Amino acid sequence: MTESHIDFRRAKFLISAPDIAHLDQYLPGDVGVEIAFAGRSNAGKSSALNALTEQKNLARTSKTPGRTQLINVFELDAQRRLVDLPGYGFAQVPLAMKMKWQQSLAEYLQKRACLSGVVVLMDIRHPLKDLDMQMIEWAVASEIPVLALLTKSDKLAQSAKMKTVNEVRKALAEFGDWVQVESFSALKGTGKPKVLSILNEWCHPQWLANELENQDNAE
């Protein structure tokens, strides 16, 4: 099947849900393709989503990290969605709330059959914290490909940036082809073409081709 190019600028807000159970209630079944964005509360997740879709206010940025508790879903087309998962790991969030978020994130990664890939965003100056590794391990254990995206790359000189990227690639080499590592700057746009290329590939898994073919045959 020839892959069509997905225009991520067409992303539009679909729904918000407090947890995975409610997500199942709101969405039309566990079908099509979802790409999830996860990261620590200060990883620049909202800024990255806005930069990738070229929409300033698609994902709301907050001056208070950890405030976004909802799972926010954005629609690309009838079959494809981007899912903005709650930020994790912020110190000022109560422990009970942290545990609830982590349980919800784990549940989503393990149970969502239409999940085609996970972008784990990390500040390039502070990569691979414990919860980042946990997210990556959960995804790979569920056989979901991961893009470890090192954000805010404009904060480092080119040599320091490449050094960090190589160190993270080495640290994640045990996961083989399941994990890719790239750097990205929402401010400068550096790394954007590569990220969009990976997302576009994830938008065309074989199971979606089979689903669409079955629909055509049924008609």
Curated annotation (Swiss-Prot):
Gene3D superfamilies in alphabetical order: P-loop containing nucleotide triphosphate hydrolases
Transcription among keywords: no
Record GO biological process: division septum assembly
Keywords from the named record: Cell cycle, Cell division, GTP-binding, Magnesium, Metal-binding, Nucleotide-binding, Septation
Domain EngB-type G: 31-205
Matches recorded under InterPro entries: G_ENGB_dom, GTP-bd, GTP-bd_ribosome_bio_YsxC, P-loop_NTPase
Organism domain of life: Bacteria
Cofactors that this protein relies on: Mg(2+)
UniProt binding sites for Mg(2+): S46, T68
GO molecular function, one term: GTP binding
GO cellular component, one term: cytosol
Keyword Cell cycle: yes
PROSITE patterns: G_ENGB (PS51706)
Annotated binding of GTP, by residue: 39-46, 66-70, 84-87, 151-154, 184-186
Biological role: Necessary for normal cell division and for the maintenance of normal septation.
Family recorded in the similarity comment: Belongs to the TRAFAC class TrmE-Era-EngA-EngB-Septin-like GTPase superfamily. EngB GTPase family.
Protein name in UniProt: Probable GTP-binding protein EngB
Organism: Shewanella oneidensis (strain ATCC 700550 / JCM 31522 / CIP 106686 / LMG 19005 / NCIMB 14063 / MR-1)
